[in-house]
Amino acid sequence: MLFTIQLIIILICLFYGARKGGIALGLLGGIGLVILVFVFHLQPGKPPVDVMLVIIAVVAASATLQASGGLDVMLQIAEKLLRRNPKYVSIVAPFVTCTLTILCGTGHVVYTILPIIYDVAIKNNIRPERPMAASSIGAQMGIIASPVSVAVVSLVAMLGNVTFDGRHLEFLDLLAITIPSTLIGILAIGIFSWFRGKDLDKDEEFQKFISVPENREYVYGDTATLLDKKLPKSNWLAMWIFLGAIAVVALLGADSDLRPSFGGKPLSMVLVIQMFMLLTGALIIILTKTNPASISKNEVFRSGMIAIVAVYGIAWMAETMFGAHMSEIQGVLGEMVKEYPWAYAIVLLLVSKFVNSQAAALAAIVPVALAIGVDPAYIVASAPACYGYYILPTYPSDLAAIQFDRSGTTHIGRFVINHSFILPGLIGVSVSCVFGWIFAAMYGFL
């Protein structure tokens, strides 16, 4: 009975925090914590300090990249690619947004490219919903495939002491599973999007809308472009510093002999990532003369700090509650998950929707899953399931896609659940999880 009451308290905090949005999600964890500790006298769990430190380092480097103009270079290259292949925008666009996320570690880079995707689609009489919805989904799917994303480094940190038949999960082991499985999922989204919805010339509602001259001008109006901008060399230098750091981190992750050893053990990749991300930010500031004051004012830094508070409050609250009832949870869920391993992926997917964060969902669920005996291989194979907040169209990138689509084809349906993102999201995540299991088996984890 007490467990049920405490679980309801946690769910109320999650629902209300998600509804308020932003930093409120993590702060609401504080309410749950105080009630659990001072009212129910549960011993406080341990906050995920390692995960939070990694997030701080990665966000600092990514925000510095944006402040330096290095991100503009990536976006300019992406726009050139899209405008050279307009007929294939429904397939190319989600790959572009996913790649940007993989390189930058955050899906928030999609906001700048969405108007360009719309312009390419509408000027070629392609239903904008096709590439717009796919691109928003693709940007978020890329998070679990990025070597510098909060979700990936968090998962590596949480699985750092876990062995798979005597073998530790290395940084590149995880990426070797998540990158190809994610890209195959993106391909599935692109193929689906190619055929979805009515062509614009057969869409009676759209044709009626543009029959009004003002509406037609609004729908087919010009969009801002990066192609006519000559970016300074410092922007290019910042981009190469950032990409070079990612390459070095990947190399150190691939070969533990390249890392210094202490007590017979190579330096943890969790610490390596922190060190090199801080180094990256410092080099960009020094070599490109980026104004440090501008770093804390951009979208990447803001969203990253919100992620830290979310992981802090939610994961600490969940650890406190589930840690106190671990024996009961093991008894109820342990056998079920062993018999139906896919149940873990469904739980992770739903929690992700509640918290609107892949990193926060992993931080809340992975420690519990390990404690009740879920095979770590299942956790790795099902990693793409940490993206579930496409289920309802409340995430900022989805809302942005709707706003940037002036044709109105990217939309939220009458029943809310029948929106433009639900099918691409289900297809992409499901296909990625299936291939995640296949690649995990190929590499000997399953």
UniProtKB/Swiss-Prot annotation:
<comment type="function">
    <text>Bifunctional protein with a transport and a regulatory function. Responsible for the transport of C4-dicarboxylates during anaerobic growth. Catalyzes the uptake of fumarate, malate, aspartate or D-tartrate coupled to the export of succinate. Can also catalyze the uptake (without exchange) of fumarate. May function primarily as a C4-dicarboxylate transporter during fumarate respiration. Required for anaerobic growth on D-tartrate.</text>
</comment>
<feature type="topological domain" description="Periplasmic">
    <location>
        <begin position="444"/>
        <end position="446"/>
    </location>
</feature>
<dbReference type="Pfam" id="PF03605">
    <property type="entry name" value="DcuA_DcuB"/>
</dbReference>
<dbReference type="GO" id="GO:0015293">
    <property type="term" value="F:symporter activity"/>
</dbReference>
<dbReference type="GO" id="GO:0005469">
    <property type="term" value="F:succinate:fumarate antiporter activity"/>
</dbReference>
<feature type="topological domain" description="Cytoplasmic">
    <location>
        <begin position="195"/>
        <end position="234"/>
    </location>
</feature>
<keyword id="KW-0472">Membrane</keyword>
<feature type="transmembrane region" description="Helical">
    <location>
        <begin position="269"/>
        <end position="287"/>
    </location>
</feature>
<feature type="topological domain" description="Periplasmic">
    <location>
        <begin position="40"/>
        <end position="53"/>
    </location>
</feature>
<feature type="topological domain" description="Cytoplasmic">
    <location>
        <begin position="71"/>
        <end position="87"/>
    </location>
</feature>
<feature type="topological domain" description="Cytoplasmic">
    <location>
        <begin position="288"/>
        <end position="313"/>
    </location>
</feature>
<feature type="intramembrane region" description="Helical">
    <location>
        <begin position="115"/>
        <end position="128"/>
    </location>
</feature>
<protein>
    <recommendedName>
        <fullName>Anaerobic C4-dicarboxylate transporter DcuB</fullName>
    </recommendedName>
</protein>
<dbReference type="GO" id="GO:0015740">
    <property type="term" value="P:C4-dicarboxylate transport"/>
</dbReference>
<keyword id="KW-0050">Antiport</keyword>
<dbReference type="InterPro" id="IPR004668">
    <property type="entry name" value="Anaer_Dcu_memb_transpt"/>
</dbReference>
<comment type="similarity">
    <text>Belongs to the DcuA/DcuB transporter (TC 2.A.13.1) family.</text>
</comment>
<feature type="intramembrane region">
    <location>
        <begin position="106"/>
        <end position="114"/>
    </location>
</feature>
<keyword id="KW-0813">Transport</keyword>
<feature type="transmembrane region" description="Helical">
    <location>
        <begin position="235"/>
        <end position="252"/>
    </location>
</feature>
<keyword id="KW-0997">Cell inner membrane</keyword>
<dbReference type="GO" id="GO:0005886">
    <property type="term" value="C:plasma membrane"/>
</dbReference>
<feature type="intramembrane region">
    <location>
        <begin position="129"/>
        <end position="133"/>
    </location>
</feature>
<feature type="transmembrane region" description="Helical">
    <location>
        <begin position="23"/>
        <end position="39"/>
    </location>
</feature>
<keyword id="KW-0769">Symport</keyword>
<keyword id="KW-1003">Cell membrane</keyword>
<keyword id="KW-0812">Transmembrane</keyword>
<feature type="transmembrane region" description="Helical">
    <location>
        <begin position="54"/>
        <end position="70"/>
    </location>
</feature>
<feature type="topological domain" description="Periplasmic">
    <location>
        <begin position="332"/>
        <end position="341"/>
    </location>
</feature>
<feature type="transmembrane region" description="Helical">
    <location>
        <begin position="342"/>
        <end position="365"/>
    </location>
</feature>
<comment type="function">
    <text>In addition, possesses a regulatory function, which is independent from the transport function, and is required for the response of the DcuS/DcuR two-component system to C4-dicarboxylates. DcuB interacts physically with DcuS and converts DcuS to the C4-dicarboxylate responsive form. However, the site for C4-dicarboxylate perception and specificity in sensing by DcuB/DcuS is located on DcuS and not on DcuB.</text>
</comment>
<feature type="transmembrane region" description="Helical">
    <location>
        <begin position="314"/>
        <end position="331"/>
    </location>
</feature>
<dbReference type="GO" id="GO:0009061">
    <property type="term" value="P:anaerobic respiration"/>
</dbReference>
<feature type="topological domain" description="Periplasmic">
    <location>
        <begin position="160"/>
        <end position="178"/>
    </location>
</feature>
<feature type="topological domain" description="Periplasmic">
    <location>
        <begin position="253"/>
        <end position="268"/>
    </location>
</feature>
<feature type="topological domain" description="Cytoplasmic">
    <location>
        <begin position="19"/>
        <end position="22"/>
    </location>
</feature>
<feature type="intramembrane region" description="Helical">
    <location>
        <begin position="134"/>
        <end position="159"/>
    </location>
</feature>
<comment type="subunit">
    <text>Interacts with DcuS. DcuB/DcuS complexes are present both in the absence or presence of fumarate.</text>
</comment>
<feature type="topological domain" description="Cytoplasmic">
    <location>
        <begin position="366"/>
        <end position="425"/>
    </location>
</feature>
<feature type="transmembrane region" description="Helical">
    <location>
        <begin position="426"/>
        <end position="443"/>
    </location>
</feature>
<feature type="transmembrane region" description="Helical">
    <location>
        <begin position="1"/>
        <end position="18"/>
    </location>
</feature>
<feature type="intramembrane region" description="Helical">
    <location>
        <begin position="88"/>
        <end position="105"/>
    </location>
</feature>
